[in-house]
Amino acid sequence: MESFASLAGGGSSSTTARLPELIPPENPDRISPPPLLYQLLAGSASSARHGHGHHHGGGGGAAAAAVQGLQVSPAGAEAAMKAEIMSHPQYSALLAAYLGCKKVGAPPDVLTKLTAVPAAQQQLDAADGHPRRRHEPRRDDDVPDHQLDQFMHADEVQGGAGAADPGSRGVLQLDSIADSNCEGTGSSEEEQDTSCPEAEEIDPSDKQLKHQLLMKYGGSLGDLRQAFSKRTKKGKLPKEARLKLLHWWELHYDKWPYPSEVEKMTLAQTTGLDQKQISNWFINQRKRHWKPTPVAGMTFPTVEAAGGGFRHSGHDGGLAAAAAAAALPLYMGSWPFVVDGMYRLGS
């Protein structure tokens, strides 16, 4: 960066002291130096050139001594940057967006303080007697600061207030999902261009309708999503219900492990299942795990191999009678018996 001496024309040859250079800001890519510093620099340079033309060297040293104390400190540069930002036409929008974000979820006392900030700022400006330039059009002699304009029009101004609204966040999320679904998967440019033609132009009324539907049915959609995530697999009963059915099965295993209609209703109330689910569970359980045990001292009918008639044998019968009894169990009285693989109730 050029020094004051070089801008003043070099001064006298006898002047060996170099004037201090301006300290650049910490982030020059975001905010440019304030125009006030350029005005001071231009005034110092013109006075130095005027002194050099009249005094032939003596004025140069006087100008150097006059601007010796004009070195800009970091604190002064920061204050000048703040003043430039506060005087920008978009400063009110930036302040409103920032306060809108802070108000989301704030306690009542903090919300009251945040609401009073704009009014207090206006009173402070009126007391200082320096109205902001946002109320005045830019003059022709003002140096345009494009970097500051870009900073003021960044996401802090345009998206700050919208990010604080939960409904706006939902709309932005839906927009991103729609954009991702409309991305073309083809390899050629024609396929990508024709993959989602309706995404090129979106009617503003559609956006408004989508926003209204989201605000109205957003809670119901969240409940449905939660219900689908907790949905059990098809054909598999809950663990607690299965434990209760298994407990009933073990208690009635020796007699007849199949509930009646009244018992099904009781089990349905305790397990939260319907009677059809209970019936299917007991049918599968009985087919897979139930093996009826004969009662001691009971006689079983056996089938004679030759004549096909029935013959009663005692408990100490032969092996053929025992095999026939195991293949065709029959319980007399009110006990059930098996015929052709089907369970029947005795009379």
UniProtKB/Swiss-Prot annotation:
Domain called ELK: residue spans? 208-228
Q: Name one GO molecular function term.
A: DNA-binding transcription factor activity, RNA polymerase II-specific
Q: Where is this region: Disordered?
A: 1-36, 122-145, 179-206
Spell out the Pro residues composition-biased ranges. Answer: 22-36
Record's superkingdom?
A: Eukaryota
Biased composition, Low complexity: where in the chain?
1-17
Q: Where is the composition biased (Acidic residues)?
A: 188-203
InterPro entries reported in the protein's UniProt record: ELK_dom, HD, Homeobox_CS, Homeodomain-like_sf, KN_HD, KNOX1, TALE_homeobox
Question: Which parts of this chain does the entry mark as a DNA-binding region?
Answer: 229-293
Which SUPFAM superfamilies does this entry report, sorted A to Z? Homeodomain-like (SSF46689)
- Which PROSITE patterns does the protein's record reference? ELK, HOMEOBOX_1, HOMEOBOX_2
- Where is it located? Nucleus
Q: Which UniProt keywords apply?
A: DNA-binding, Homeobox, Nucleus
> Where does this chain mainly localize?
nucleus
For this record, the Gene Ontology CC terms, alphabetical, are: nucleus
Q: Which family does the entry's similarity section mention?
A: Belongs to the TALE/KNOX homeobox family.
Its protein name is Homeobox protein knotted-1-like 9
Question: What organism does the record attribute this protein to?
Answer: Oryza sativa subsp. japonica
Phylogenetic classification of the source organism: Eukaryota, Viridiplantae, Streptophyta, Embryophyta, Tracheophyta
